[in-house]
Amino acid sequence: IKDGRVSFPRGKEKEYNVKDRKGLMQEDRNYLFVKRFTAKEERRRLQCGIYLKRYLSSFTYISSQNKANFIDGLQGLSECAVYGLYVIFNSTLYDVYYRILNGSTQVNSTEINAMPVPDMSVIEAMGKQLIAAKNLSVEQCNNILNHYVNG
């Protein structure tokens, strides 16, 4: 995960689909990936990257490593929804909230799933704003989220 996006390939051995590791295989669709492990020294606990199906559209499945959680919808997520979720999980508000929930450097998927999020229509609206801004910075995410939180 680098600069708000999933960076692939990284040039490491065995980073491609490993068919014998079914637990690491996902259908190729839009996801928000969240790093599972962060160092104590890192400023942020929630570090996420956008992955869109169109990046590798020729594949039916993709493989991830167990060092990343992924956020997905039951019916998949639109690109706007992925960007909207990025606004939420890349914001300072949610990073601080997560640190209050969990003092560990490991980002737990159970705790991510328990975090409150707005309705999907709001998430998609935030995503549209982020796409239009063409700026994935924490500050931009904070500005968009604050508009919805504070009115």
PLM feature segments, named:
Residues I1-A132:
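Polybasic, glycine- and aromatic-enriched phosphate-binding surface used to engage nucleic acids
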Residues D119-G151:
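Non-catalytic DNA-recognition/assembly elements of restriction-modification systems
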